[in-house]
Amino acid sequence: MAIMRVNPTRMELTRLKKRLQVARRGHKLLKDKLDELMKQFLDLVRKNKELREKVEEMLMKAHQDFLIARAVMSSEGLEAALMLPKQSISLDVSTQNIMSVEVPVLKFTTSSSDESDIYPYGFASTSGELDGAILTLSKVLPYMLELAQMEKSSQLLAQEIEKTRRRVNALEYVMIPQLTETIKYISMKLDENERGNITRLMKVKDMMLEQAHNFKEKLNEA
């Protein structure tokens, strides 16, 4: 791991030690966030799978009923029955926060609270299979919106997981090792400088003692 290009001073050493503390703290927080994101994501994927199977089953039933209705009714009669719906739907889109990720919340309201208004026709000229298909589609709509909400949430969480994982890896495998190695390097340099200073001081001391000894000998000779 390459060290940073810094001056090997005590001030720089103190600064880098503080950066290392912050990096380790940030790494722990991001790792905890990543673990929770993964937990939320996997739970969402499991629920999404179960809901998708339910929606597909209901849509398959509605499709089969429509096929039977088409077989027993004329094309003109089927088109006329479905031409003028009694209900309209309003979709409300909001968001909720999951681990700092804004995910969609989809809710709908109908223009009428009368459940029979889902049928845009009279029952005299239509088949029971068409009624069943309309009823199934009416029931499956909330699940389809929930499924769309889950799939978009899963996509957004997956993106956040990838982004968080890159940040965790950058700290764990690049920044923290680089800071650690640079701190070791500066500490080693400072130790070398200190040993060098001690050696120089010892030499100066020896020289002063030698000069004092020589001066004393000259005085004795005089």
UniProtKB/Swiss-Prot annotation:
Disulfide bond residue pairs: none
Gene Ontology MF term list: ATP binding; proton-transporting ATP synthase activity, rotational mechanism; proton-transporting ATPase activity, rotational mechanism
Entries under InterPro entries matching the protein? V_ATPase_D
For this entry, list what GO says about its biological process. proton motive force-driven plasma membrane ATP synthesis
> Which top-level group of life is the source organism from?
Bacteria
List the keywords (alphabetical).
ATP synthesis, Hydrogen ion transport, Ion transport, Transport
Described function: Produces ATP from ADP in the presence of a proton gradient across the membrane.
HAMAP family per UniProt: ATP_synth_D_arch
As for family, the record states: Belongs to the V-ATPase D subunit family.
Q: Which PANTHER family match?
A: V-TYPE ATP SYNTHASE SUBUNIT D
Q: What is this protein called?
A: V-type ATP synthase subunit D
Q: Which organism is it from?
A: Acetivibrio thermocellus (strain ATCC 27405 / DSM 1237 / JCM 9322 / NBRC 103400 / NCIMB 10682 / NRRL B-4536 / VPI 7372)
